[in-house]
């Protein structure tokens, strides 16, 4: 592509995305909607994208300052094959369907996807029947290509695996993905197709009206013909306002460690251990960005906000991961984090997906394999809502979306042409990840308003120094692009301000 045409393409795309995201932030002032979606995680955004195929007025409400601020930002980043879920369950169905949909969805939305496959390790001959049970479950669920591997074949596939592993269940359809990239892509595509997004909007209560529902928020009352509950760990509280059968969600906190990219080749596949009652256990997996991810732990708690990491949790994580891959270089950990899984402890033992009350649809209790299931859940619920509203499909639905150009991955001639069209793409701001000013500006134009919003969109601050070098420059760029004082900028919205004032003014 010539420099002139490349420049035109970049400019045109930027204008389109800027317009779309401003629409997302401000929205047309409609207070009566056909559908209100509550929750801007990957499930809510998948529902929004699928529902935007129809001629409907749709609004997604998110209590944080951006999408992808809850469980969707802190999980294992893997596409489960579907062998673990109980046959006949909703978890099994939506897992397998979501896994089948994911690769083509990633192509449409320009998201990184790597079908690296997964291995479930068995360390004792006495546990082989449990491994066989996983194999049979997978076959019943319709998972393709499953087999049990042993000995030399296992070690050829995964050279660093523990010598104590006697066998493994091989699932070639397992994959890895970027959960941030997926969530943002779904949201952007939904916005391109007319969905409104209202951020910093907390739902306080929902009431029935003659025309549907009144959704009371901290920013006023919105009316809608239907409501879709995708509120993560808070989904039970919304459910219990409108449904006779009550749910209780008890979050499970999972801690993770992320290792430096130099260790990313220590695992070629996602490596599990045999699951327990608490979940699929601690895994070791490569990421689509080249790091090594270890986790999660599983600790039940009543607090729906507590996401701290603990010394005890990280110690148990290290010990458990070492059973799969001995001598992991934990000194190379560049960050640790935790996320909450929305585990239902009362009222259901499966995903709650469907029309739970007249006009009230939901995806509740979406724990693992929720990321994998999101595309299938979105398609299913969108169809139910559309049928309820007698909605007509659009003829001009936009099915594709372009990712922000990853400058460091472009061929040399394309990189040169991009820099010639916009010099900002030649200014490296984040040295660890080699992220340019042009990429950061594009992230802001697509909705980033905080350091974490930029970080998750383009990885500035995601590398070895975790923003120690680039954070001040990123803040300068955000301040310049949004016209906001640096003292008003936050790490992740709310009260997470990074600066308290100017040096000579603070006493």
Predicted regions, residues:
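N-terminal Rossmann-like FAD-binding beta1-loop-alpha1 element of flavoenzymes
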Residues: 35-59
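Short hydrophobic core segments
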Residues: 36-38, 222-234, 378
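Active-site substrate-recognition segment that forms the wall
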Residues: 46-50, 79, 111-114, 231-359, ...
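Short beta-strand to alpha-helix junction loop
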Residues: 93-96, 124-130, 170-188, 307-312, ...
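Helical element adjacent to the flavin cofactor pocket in flavoenzyme catalytic cores
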Residues: 173-225
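C-terminal catalytic lobe of FAD-dependent flavoproteins
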Residues: 288, 305-428, 435-443, 452-453, ...
């Amino acid at each position: 592509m010539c420099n002139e045409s490349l420049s035109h393409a970049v400019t045109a795309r930027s204008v389109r995305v800027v317009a779309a995201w401003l629409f997302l932030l401000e929205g047309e002032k409609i207070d009566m909607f056909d559908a209100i979606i509550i929750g801007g995680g990957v499930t809510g955004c998948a529902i929004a994208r699928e529902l935007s195929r129809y001629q409907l007025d749709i609004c997604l409400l998110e209590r944080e300052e951006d999408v992808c601020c809850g469980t969707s930002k802190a999980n294992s980043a893997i596409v489960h094959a579907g062998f673990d879920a109980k046959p006949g369950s909703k978890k099994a169905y939506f897992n397998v369907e979501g896994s089948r949909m994911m690769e083509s969805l990633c192509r449409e939305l320009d998201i990184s996807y790597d079908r690296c496959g997964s291995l479930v390790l068995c360390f004792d001959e006495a546990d082989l029947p449990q491994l066989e049970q996983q194999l049979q479950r997978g076959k019943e669920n319709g998972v393709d290509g499953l087999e049990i591997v042993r000995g030399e074949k296992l070690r050829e596939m995964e050279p660093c695996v523990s010598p104590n592993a006697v066998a493994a269940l091989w699932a070639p359809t397992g994959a890895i993905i970027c959960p941030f990239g997926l969530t943002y892509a779904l949201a952007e595509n939904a916005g391109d197709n007319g969905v409104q997004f209202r951020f910093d909007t907390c739902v306080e209560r929902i009431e029935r009206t003659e025309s549907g529902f009144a959704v009371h928020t901290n920013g006023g009352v919105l009316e809608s013909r239907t409501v879709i509950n995708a509120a993560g760990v808070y989904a039970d509280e919304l459910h219990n306002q409108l449904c006779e059968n009550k749910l209780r969600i008890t979050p499970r906190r999972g801690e993770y460690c992320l290792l430096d990219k130099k260790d990313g080749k220590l695992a070629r596949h996602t490596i599990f251990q045999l699951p327990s009652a608490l979940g699929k256990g601690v895994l070791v997996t490569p990421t689509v960005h080249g790091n090594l991810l270890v986790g999660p732990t599983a600790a039940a708690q009543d607090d729906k906000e507590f996401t701290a990491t603990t010394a005890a949790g990280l110690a148990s994580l290290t010990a458990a991961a070492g059973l799969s891959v001995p001598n992991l270089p934990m000194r190379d950990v560049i960050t640790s984090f935790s996320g909450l899984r929305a585990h239902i402890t009362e009222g259901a033992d499966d995903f709650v997906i469907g029309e739970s009350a007249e006009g009230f649809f939901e995806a509740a209790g979406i724990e693992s394999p929720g990321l994998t299931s999101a595309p299938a859940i979105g398609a299913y619920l969108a169809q139910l809502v559309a049928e309820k509203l007698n909605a007509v499909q659009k003829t001009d639905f936009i099915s594709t979306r372009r990712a922000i150009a990853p400058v460091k991955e472009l061929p040399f001639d394309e990189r040169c042409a991009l820099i010639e069209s916009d010099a900002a793409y030649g200014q490296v701001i984040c040295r660890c990840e080699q992220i340019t000013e042009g990429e950061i500006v594009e992230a802001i134009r697509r909705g980033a308003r905080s350091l974490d919003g930029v970080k998750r969109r383009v990885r500035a601050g995601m590398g070895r120094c975790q923003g120690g070098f680039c954070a001040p420059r990123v803040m300068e760029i955000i301040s310049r692009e949004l016209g906001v004082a640096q003292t008003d900028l936050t790490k992740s919205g709310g009260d997470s301000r990074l600066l308290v004032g100017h040096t000579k003014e603070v006493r």
